[in-house]
């Protein structure tokens, strides 16, 4: 062999035709015979290498078991120690990729990063103990202290941030970006969490999307939810199929399902109400268990709590309503109605003074505008019945 450098007892001692090797340390590259282009620094580094070429090993026992693996870079005590035939791996840090045997194209930076990986390929791990329990899970990216720490066979996960996807084991296709995002997720798949503690309590809930500070924070098994905004769906645990956009929107929802909410503080107090639509600042804000309500507009249906079947479209339409089965369309339509039920009001300030009157119909500008407690009234036209 030509252009070899060996420093230390038994270093490169069996080399026959290998070229351009550098071996520094007791028994480093001791069993290499024909391999070339290796750099080995440290006691027993690349000790068992025979034909593996173009490897770099720096540190005690780094790449110790490598036999035919090529183009690996190992820096740190016991980094890539058990690698035998794996190629194109990079391990930087104490015990980085220590147990890897055949896995390829992995990058591990940090103490114990990808420690337990054996045959999995295409993982990237940056941070103390990130992906350290991973064995055969492939195509994962973990950046941050203990990110994806407990992952074993889960695949195609992306975790960026301290303890993001911390205890995930077999869940796949998850994206967690932010401190503790999806921290408690174990087996659930296809979740996306972006923001501090977003979906951080989720265990088995699938296909949720949470974007924002503490969005869907306590969700555990709820599925198919979308929460965008600070504290959106923060209290949701098992509620499913909710779509929420806006700061504090639906922040108290626990088990309510099939709701659509858009606007700051809209649907804020809802806990178990289902199949509601709230669009606008404070729309349906006080609703707790009411179902089947539609509120579109600033403060629309703001005070309804437990009743359902109401439709309010317009600025402060049905704002004070606590009854059911009312329909109000227009600016201030039925604004002060409280317990009146089964009314239909369409037009600017139509039925605007109604409080407890029921079964009325008002169509037109200011229609029935003076009615307060009367029942079974009908008015059609400009200021009709006013």
Regions found by a protein language model. Name each.
Residues 1-386:
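Glycine- and small/polar-enriched repetitive beta-structure motifs of secreted/surface proteins
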């Amino acid at each position: 062999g030509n252009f070899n450098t060996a420093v230390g007892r038994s270093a490169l001692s069996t080399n026959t035709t290998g070229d351009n090797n550098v071996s520094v340390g007791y028994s480093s590259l001791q069993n290499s015979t024909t391999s070339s282009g290796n750099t080995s620094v440290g006691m027993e580094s690349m000790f068992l290498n025979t034909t593996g070429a173009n490897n770099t090993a720096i540190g005690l026992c780094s790449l110790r078991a490598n036999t035919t693996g090529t183009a690996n870079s190992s820096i740190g005590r016991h980094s890539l120690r058990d690698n035998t035939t794996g190629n194109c791996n990079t391990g930087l840090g104490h015990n980085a990729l220590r147990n890897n045997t055949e896995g390829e194209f992995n990058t591990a930076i940090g103490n114990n990063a990808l420690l337990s990986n054996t045959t999995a390929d295409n993982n990237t791990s940056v941070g103390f103990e990130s992906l350290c329990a991973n064995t055969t899970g492939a195509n994962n990216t973990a950046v941050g202290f203990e990110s994806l720490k407990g992952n074993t066979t889960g695949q195609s996960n992306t975790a960026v941030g301290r303890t993001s996807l911390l205890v995930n084991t077999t869940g796949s296709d998850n994206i967690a970006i932010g401190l503790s995002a999806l921290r408690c997720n174990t087996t659930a798949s296809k979740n996306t969490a972006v923001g501090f503690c977003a979906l951080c309590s989720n265990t088995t809930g699938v296909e949720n999307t949470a974007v924002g500070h503490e969005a869907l924070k306590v969700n555990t098994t709820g599925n198919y939810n979308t929460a965008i905004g600070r504290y959106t769906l923060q209290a949701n645990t098992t509620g499913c199929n909710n779509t929420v956009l806006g700061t504090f929107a639906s922040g108290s929802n626990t088990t309510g399902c099939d709701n659509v909410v858009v606007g700051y503080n809209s649907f804020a107090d809802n806990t178990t109400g289902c199949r509601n639509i709230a669009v606008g600042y404070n729309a349906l804000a006080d609703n707790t268990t009411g179902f089947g309500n539609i509120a579109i507009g600033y403060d629309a249906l703001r005070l309804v709590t437990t009743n359902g079947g109401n439709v309010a479209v317009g600025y402060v339409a049905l704002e004070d309503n606590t009854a059911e089965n009312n329909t109000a369309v227009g600016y201030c339509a039925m604004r002060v109605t409280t317990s009146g039920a089964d009314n239909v009001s369409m037009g600017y300030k139509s039925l605007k003074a109604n409080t407890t009157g029921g079964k009325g119909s008002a169509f037109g500008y200011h229609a029935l505008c003076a009615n307060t407690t009367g029942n079974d009234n009908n008015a059609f036209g400009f200021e009709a019945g006013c």
